[in-house]
Amino acid sequence: MGVGGGGGGGGGEAAAAVAVEGDEAGKGRRWWRVKVKLSTVAVVAWVLASAALWAGLHWRFRRAALHKAEEALVCMCEERARMLQDQFAVSVNHVHALAILVATFHYDKHPPALDQDTFAVYAARTSFERPLLSGVAYAQRVVHADRESFERQQGWIIKTMKHEPSPAQDEYAPVIYSQETISYIEGLDVMSGEEDRENILRARATGKAVLTRPFRLMSNHLGVVLTFPVYLVDLPNDTAVEDRVAATAGYLGGAFDVESLVENLLRQLAGNQELVVNVYDVTNHSNPLVMYGSEVPLGIPSPSHTYTLDFGDPLRKHQMVCRYRNKLHVSWSAITTPSGVFVICMLVGYIIYAAWSRYDNVKEDCRKMEALKKRAEAADIAKSQFLATVSHEIRTPMNGVLGMLDMLLDTELKSTQRDYAQTAQVCGKALISLINEVLDRAKIEAGKIDLESVPFDLRSILDDVISLFSSKSREKGIELAVYVSERVPEILLGDPGRFRQIITNLVGNSIKFTERGHIFVQVHLADHSNLATEAKIEPVVNGMNGHKDEAIAIPTSGSHNTLSGFEAADSRNNWENFKLLLSYEKNEMPYESDSDKVTLVVSVEDTGIGIPLHAQGRVFTPFMQADSSTSRNYGGTGIGLSISKCLVEIMGGQINFVSRPLVGSTFTFTAVLRRCDKNAISDSKTVALHPLPSSFKGLSALLVDKRPVRATVTKYHLQRLGITSEVVGTIDPTFGVLSGRNGSSLTSIGKKQPCMLLIESDSWGPQMDVSLHARLQEMKQSDRIHVLPKVFLLSAAESDKVKKIHAVDSVIPKPLKASALAACLFQALGITQPSHEKRDDSGSLHGRDGSGSLHGLLLGKNILVVDDNKVNLRVAAGTLKKYGAKVECVESGKDALSLLQVPHKFDLCLMDIQMPEMDGFEATRQIRAMEGKANEQADDSESGSEIAAKTAKWHLPILAMTADVIQATHEECTKCGMDGYVSKPFEEKQLFQAVQKFLGPCVSS
């Protein structure tokens, strides 16, 4: 019912969680739609703003480029206009100079010194000074009264510009001197034309040069005629018009080729290809006349520049208009710069958008992660509850089975019945072990494993692990050995259970896959070890020659200097390296470190089948094995190594391996533990520390072993018992060593004769059964030895050959461990074991006063057992009664409350956790509440201090009985007021450790 109810509650919570999640999902979708709309609007607005910025910058840069082009146009146009004016002024000055020449040599000389030929020659020779004039001529002023005499004097009649006789006029201006280039105008009256007449009259009235309107010259170029008055005398600038007319002698004129003038000018300047230059006569603004350039109207498209020219004639107006030949193109800067800014804006916008999107995504992810976290926490709680329930519900019936089998084995059984019961017990323990492994993996995944920190004896733990596999190793005939460096502290602080679990998993795997050779467990300090602590997981294939598994030859025994003579997977694990390590540890001074941390390097080496190359990458993957045949042939689930790796990492270490198919494997891991001071050891009651017997101190032994690694391991175990030893390789030098002759020396045991002779079984020859006994008797009779040494045979296998040997006092079975070796030596040497060093059946030492015995703790104690399972009640009651306790059982928490009303008779309560109606947690809370109330009443009571002192001590030790191995359950036990817990089924050692705190003699007293 409890499980079903829990499932219903879990379903309701799941439905509520789904509903909340649905609401959150709906809100999330609505927010997503709003966010998409806002993002779209923001993106469009940013693009439009960037485009507007591009347009503004483009307009500004284009205007700047146009303004710069206009300024350049103004500069170039004004430069050309000034140069044109300057050159025109120079030409006018030359005409003026020629007019002065005529006035000087024609009118001031009598007779005149100037004639046509002279004028023509002079004009031709000085024409280089007037490159812009196509020709010059001088016309004399002739009044009508003087016409006739003038014509007689010149020898020709005055003609009009049309070469017709000039009609009668007030005055005439016939050309009398001309440059040869325009000699065709000689005798023509330049005043016969209306415009020419006006220009001549204006010139003599102002005294300045005047210009005609542009016309086509004989060269087909556009040009103008410059007219300059010639006076008989020099006149001041303010001379009246009438005086100027009266003083006028004639007129000097020249034809200007304006097109040639401008062309020559433009050729002298750079940039002409870019400009179009036009020169206009704008005297009549409504009808401008082109003087140079094409006939383009003045309304020229921008940009253009107009410059007013001053040729010295105040009446006529001239302008120069400049414009670019080609249409101005948009400058690259007006395109590239705004485009670059636009790209930058878009990139910035993209970055902002990406950052904002990232922020939104992160925010959304955080929201989802928060929701997932809540779901994960809920799932974690559900998983913990599920694991607790499964652990309890699966282990409870199995514990009942194992408990009943224990009780059955305590009864009188036939041999066949006992064998059946023992077989069932082994199978049940194997199933419990498998369940524990699966639950351990689940606890690791749930993060529910916390390490203990209690003092423990590492060497004792290794001895216990070796004991577990001793029978299996003897059946297979393989060497199983342990060596712990003397530098490793005897007592360490850590989690002994988890350390034992790692070693057990690794040794168990080695036992499973090893059929010959050895399994060697070594423990060294990391500071002293140069072994494979950092070995990488990489395949080693037949000496790295690339052959596959089936190409690897099986190594033969005796060819390698290892524990058994078989080759090891890690080539560094040989006698040479082992000897160097031993020498280093022996010679090094004790190292005192400020840190209390101790880093151990533990290696488990085997000569088994190794790990195939294709499977080495998934060795630590849960439930994975090399192939499907592995489980069929060797059994197992493939979870042990995965759990070991996780535990090693939780302990702050690393695990690696080196494996070679058909050679073997070496697993190496590090573990970080702490040193333990003597006070912590003496005060601690958590772990029972079992000291080894001291009865063998001072004894010496001689060891016959041809394998130095194996001999070192044997010396290690003898040394633990205080026995010094010497090693010889074969049996022959043994007799010399025993007698101290033949140059033999006992380096390790001094001059003292060994009292025992230990011989390895593979050093025992076929005739030694007779010869050894005879030789020893002979040596005793000849007084070479005084006492016959006890002869022990060391054997790793149970064989008929060993059983038939009669010349030995005892056979010491392997694997060696100190306690078993001590027991064998006690019996063979006839040494009486002191009572304080004897152990009871449970493995606990009997104290001198018997306080260490579980039987002594429980004898006569009243214990209440609370469990809803009748089988468990029977098992618990039977176990406790076996140790002399008085047991009373109830099936519910309510019944327990009624029996535990203060005052009561019970010394201890064992409480199941999961029970219907009222579980163990709630029952414990109510018991503690009752005790607290009773203690308060006792404190307030006025009945006397003695009664108050007695009743104030009401605190019944309550221990949880649980098949649940989840850490959260243990924490809940402490939180509700329980004093500890014991696992079901009861294990004698653990039960002793749990109850001695409350029922020990120091407590009772």
UniProtKB/Swiss-Prot annotation:
Main location: membrane
Gene3D superfamilies per the UniProt record, alphabetical: 1.10.287.130, 3.40.50.2300, 6.10.250.1190, CHASE domain, Histidine kinase-like ATPase, C-terminal domain
Cytoplasmic side of membrane: 1-37, 355-1005
InterPro entries, sorted: 2C_system_His_kinase, CHASE_dom, CHASE_sf, CheY-like_superfamily, HATPase_C_sf, His_kinase_dom, HisK_dim/P_dom, HisK_dim/P_sf
Key word Lipoprotein present: no
Residue intervals passing through the bilayer: 38-58, 334-354
Tissue and organ expression note: Highly expressed in young leaves and spikelets, and at lower levels in roots, mature leaves and stems.
Listed name of the protein: Probable histidine kinase 4
Organism listed in the record: Oryza sativa subsp. japonica (Rice)
Gene assigned in the entry: HK4
